[in-house]
Amino acid sequence: MGRPGVRIPATDLAAHPRVSGGCPAAHHVLMDPSAVRAHRQVTALAQADLPLDELGAELSVALGGVVPHEGYCLIGFDPISGLRTFQTDRNTLVGSPARLVRNETLEHDLHRFTDLARQPSPVGTLGGGALGEDRSPRLHEILVEQGFSRELRLALRDRATLWGALVLLRERGRPPFTAEQAVAATAIAPPLTQAVRQVSVRLRGQPPPPLPPGVVIVGPDDTAEAISTQAAAWFSDFAAAEQPLPYVVLQAAAAARTGLGAGADQLARIRTRSGRWLGLAACPLDSDHVAVVVQPATTDQLLPALAAWYEFTPRQLDVLHLLLQGHSIKQIARRLELSPHTVEDHLKTLYRKTRTNSHQELIAALR
């Protein structure tokens, strides 16, 4: 019988008052200078405002001394719908993402991201002989087929929200991830979660004008039966060129086919490389085919996710909504029955949270 899987408390272990007495593995890791250094480096990366690919590369280097790995994948999720919004990786799984989408959304497997987000521990490992690994499709049909035999997954979550995930991979012949290494990965989750939230909304420069809406018809075999010119233009602004279809397109199509999340928000809000806001949603055409629509995200579509990413309060969101509609401070104050001074205070907080300095910058950052 396999040994139990790793289960580590979902907390910043370096700050936990009981960790040294209650978890020998955690105590060993926290006394290890390399683990302390990795935590400090990741905390600094979270504050460095790096481009996505650079963040992933620097993160891999920072973790390499305490959790050695050959490949990594850093992922972001829409906090409302749970659809994938970005990914950066190196030496990881190649080819069409359709098989991974099927594993993550339809198959029963160990350590799916949504499962890790709900469990006491946000970390899970494959390839160490844990109970149930002999029946893991991801391990035997995906990882091993591509030359990997060990996987560590870390859900980046707080409270009830899944913001992103980190996947570390080891090639065949490499040792399994240890309990100490799982603890070290868990310890960097809080600063890495903050970094992922910032990357999701970051604006670099003035975005170009929005592109027209586009559509993709996804067939029963998860291939594109038709892609409009407009959809292809959107994909070139946020997806890897070598992908037949972006992961999020197939993920949205799978959710539409199965009715997962029916009646709920199933929109992926994606900040593209150029700074545009894209809204992506899918609807079934028949039992086999799905239409995926890509178009500029509207203000009303963006606000729920922006409120989550930036931690806007309900009142701050009220002020922001009216500001984006073109109302002046006096008009906002009158509509919300507040003093102009109070509205100004709310705006100052919005500037701070979004790292902007004026109405114009704030509006540009959120459109």
Whereabouts are the PLM-identified features?
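Short helix-to-turn junction characteristic of helix-turn-helix DNA-binding domains
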Residues: 323-327, 366
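Recognition helix of helix-turn-helix DNA-binding domains
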Residues: 309, 326-361
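Short alpha-helical interdomain "coupling" segment at the junction between an upstream regulatory sensor module
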Residues: 196-210
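Short amphipathic alpha-helical boundary/capping segments
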Residues: 304-312
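The N-cap/first-turn positions of alpha helices
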Residues: 315-319
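Regulatory input/activation interfaces that engage signals or partners
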Residues: 33-180, 184, 190-198
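PAS-family sensory/regulatory modules and their coupling/dimerization elements
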Residues: 251-299
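PAS-family sensory domains
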Residues: 211-271
